From Swiss-Prot:
GO terms for molecular function: metal ion binding; nuclease activity. Residues 166-278 form the PINc domain. It comes from Listeria monocytogenes serovar 1/2a (strain ATCC BAA-679 / EGD-e). An RNase. Belongs to the ycf81 family. In the central section; belongs to the PINc/VapC protein family. This is Uncharacterized PIN and TRAM-domain containing protein Lmo0234. Pfam families: PIN.
Amino acid sequence: MLTWVIRVCFLILGGTTGVFSLPALWVKLGIGHILLINNPYTDALIGALIFYLITFWAVKYVEAALNWLEEKLAKIAIATLVYGGLGLFVGLVIAFFASNALSQTNIPLLNSVVPVILTLVLGYLGFRIGISRRNEFGNFVNNRNAKKRTPEEEKTEEKSKKTYKILDTSVIIDGRIADILTTGFLDGTVVIPLFVLAELQHIADSSDTLKRTRGRRGLDILNRIQKEDAIQVEMYEGDFEDTPEVDSKLVKLAKVMGGIVVTNDYNLNKVCEFQNVPVLNINDLANAVKPVVLPGEKMTVLMVKDGKEHNQGVAYLDDGTMIVVEDGRKFINETIQVEVTSVLQTSAGRMIFAKPS
């Protein structure tokens, strides 16, 4: 279908070009007086035929270019296209009025070359400004609409915004998010950005065995989440091409959608907090449901290896919590009773420090 559309466009372009260009050629060739040749119908037919023959060579290149453009546009968010188009329109309108003013002058350079340059430059600047300032324009429109809403409507909208849970790559690979969503601890719509899916696919195609296993596990987790009827899943097909890092794209997406980033990445957690973006770290949830351990409490553990510091030993609880035991190196591969001295709690996890009792 696309091939025939391209050929029809070439036919129309060829016919138009023939009507406007061939009469001058006939005059130069000395056959302009022959009405059978020098008439609009013959010119259009010859031009259309020439351009149609060109399509047999050019159609594949035009089709490839259109497919490439379609693929690029499909990755751009609708808001980006809308604001970019508005910026382009404003730029072209300004260029139109400026060109009209310049065309009144008698200076050849100003009334011929400069208007073309102005159209190109102002159109491009308008498009770029529209894209780069789309968030500010969106916030401006939202603020104006917010003044017209009642407090009840604002609360309802704020609640609906916060229901978007945007998953990052690390939390998908981790796998625990599937169980959390299934149990209903997280409400709202789960958003899977296309750029996160692309990163997962890239990891799954890695030559490194460990990375490949992690990537495939992440894809399996996504399929499991999508098949759950109780979980609302949306794919975000937009992209932020000016931002190469996936983490930065997630932060921008959360700002645009008004959603919450769900992660277990400590660094992304801190970046979101710094930029005032709501974030849920499932490590915080995991730590919250772990049994509370207080200094002075005694427990029985199996010493499995030595620690980083001198004479330290390392043991683990059943939930995976690391216990660093002072002077515990000599008890490796032995089950001993220890006394808790302190507990270190962070978003990255929990660590218990103890000594032999």
